Amino acid sequence: MSKIIIPENYTPALNLYDTQRAIGTVKRLFADTLCATLNLYRVSAPLFVEASTGLNDDLNGVERKVTFDTKDSGIEVQVVQSLAKWKRKALKDYGFRVGKGLYCDMNAIRRDEDMDNLHSIYVDQWDWEKVIREEDRNEAYLKNVVRSIVSAVCATEMNLHAMFPQLQDLPLHTPNVTFITTQELEDKYPDLTPKERENAIVKENGTTFLTKIGAPLKSGKPHDGRAPDYDDWDLNGDLLFWNEPLQCSYELSSMGIRVSPESMDRQLTAAGCDDRRELPFHKAVLNGELPYTIGGGIGQSRLCMLLLGSAHIGEVQASVWDNATREACEKAGIPLL
């Protein structure tokens, strides 16, 4: 059974019909605003990639990928878990220049996801990637992009409230962002777990960008797992918002400046993944054949949850839930799609 939290006195702000209208509105408005802000262009995205290319996202390195072989060729393919590495290659293949980028509507299956109010085995997100200069690989550039994304969220929210007056009782988010490193967070809350630290900082400060995820902290453990072959662990982070119905923080976006040849070399060794060096994607990065980029994924259902004040991700996306979860939600008046 998936884990579930039933908030007290929770009532959805919109009925099912208006929820569907609002979901479409959020996806259209936010994508348009994000593209204008970051100079992105939409491209078509694959649902699966060849296993031998190394293009699939390994996430934390333990999640099983949905894999099958094709009838005609027998090639082994994998349903994508994200497009983090595919996008960087696509920027080169499609001829994108510095200052321009792409985004796509990414749909993924994560079979090993621990399902709860915020997590589903079905993942839908805007996957985006942008070509940058080598000198843009710094914290100031990363923070400016984070602020742009948060501003796009706030602009979408303002327009949504104007179109759906039923949402006007929900608190509006501000464009203010707190930036803190994982080590600073551990130092601030040494007796809390990583998730408890996130809850504490976001409850205290609101929207927070937690930086430098992947490398071990002074405690000897990383704040969270990160694959060694796309984000630079010194130039990445998670964008966290506060979920009012659930009274917890949650990640809207994981993003970062991507690995250089030097940082990929270090991170592959640190993670014990030197065997990946011969994969086509990894060889291209290590040989300096791919552009410097920044990118990330922004959860579509997560953003809809945030702006509609939803208590369960199943209110804004159609997925599979066990009977106990469906019965508990129905009893509590939480309508799952």
Model-based region annotation:
Residues 2-119, 127-131:
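Class II aminoacyl-tRNA synthetase-like tRNA-binding/catalytic domains
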Residues 18-25, 29, 137-144, 148, ...:
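Generic recognition of stable, solvent-exposed alpha-helical segments in well-folded globular domains
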Residues 30, 34-41, 149-160, 311:
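A generic secondary-structure signal for well-formed alpha-helical elements
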Residues 47-51, 165-172, 324-326:
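A glycine-rich phosphate-binding loop feature that marks nucleotide/adenosyl-phosphate handling sites
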Residues 68-70, 92-98, 118-120, 169, ...:
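A general structural signal for short secondary-structure junctions and capping/turn motifs
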Residues 100-102, 123-127, 205-207, 249:
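Extracellular structured ligand-interaction cores
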Residues 104-194:
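Extended, charged alpha-beta segments that form solvent-exposed binding/catalytic grooves
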Residues 109, 180-337:
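A translation/RNA-centric and nucleic-acid-associated enzymatic feature enriched
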